[in-house]
A protein has these predicted regions:
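Conserved serine DD-peptidase/penicillin-binding transpeptidase domain
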Residues: 13-174
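Short, conserved glycine- and acidic-residue-centered signature motifs
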Residues: 1-2, 117
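Active/ligand-binding-proximal structured segments within catalytic/core domains
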Residues: 2-11
Length: 174
């Protein structure tokens, strides 16, 4: 609990109380879609449904049918989801939910979601299928800020969900 207070103060100081986290669906120049997030703990199923709708409207690659989506999901590798010194038993509880870029419902459903990437992938696939499409999903490493500045940005923002302001999100953690 003490560590959360320090983290909260640091976040407020560096980002400000009105900062909002973004989750984005972008189309790359080659037509591939990418889902990338900043760790919004309040991203929910309704937001995921809106991302699926946006993906279905664009398709996934040049020449692909409107019902096919080729999606790359930028997510941290599993070994980064928890601090190294956390006891594995703590990971089952809601307070031990993994820290990810694309958390759905705070990565907790009563207890912690043990594999949030698989949960997101499964729910996204179900939503695309429900809408009559098909999807190929691939997990990729997030691009660092230095790598991002070196790339040409020919991507097109298709949909964005923004979090509540930082001051409201902090009440979820404390």
């Amino acid at each position: 609990s003490n560590q959360k207070l320090i983290s909260t103060a640091f976040a407020l100081d560096r980002l400000g109380p009105d900062f909002r986290l973004r989750t984005q669906l972008v189309q790359q120049a080659d037509g591939t879609l990418e889902l990338k997030g900043q760790g919004d703990p309040d991203l929910g199923i309704a937001g995921l449904q809106r991302f699926a709708m946006a993906a279905m409207g664009q398709g996934g690659a040049r020449g692909a049918s409107a019902g096919f989506v080729n999606l790359k999901v930028q997510e941290e590798p599993r070994q980064n989801w928890w601090p190294n010194d956390w006891h594995p038993a703590d990971r089952a509880y809601a307070y031990g939910a993994p820290i990810t870029r694309l958390a759905l419902t705070s990565n907790a459903l009563g207890g912690a979601v043990s594999d949030p990437y698989r949960r997101l992938e499964t729910l996204f696939k179900k939503e695309v299928k429900r809408r009559g499409g098909s999807i190929q999903v691939q997990q990729v490493q997030p691009i660092s800020n230095s790598q991002q500045s070196q790339q040409s940005d020919d991507s097109i923002l298709l949909h964005e969900e923004t979090s509540a302001p930082m001051h409201a999100l902090l009440s979820l953690a404390n």
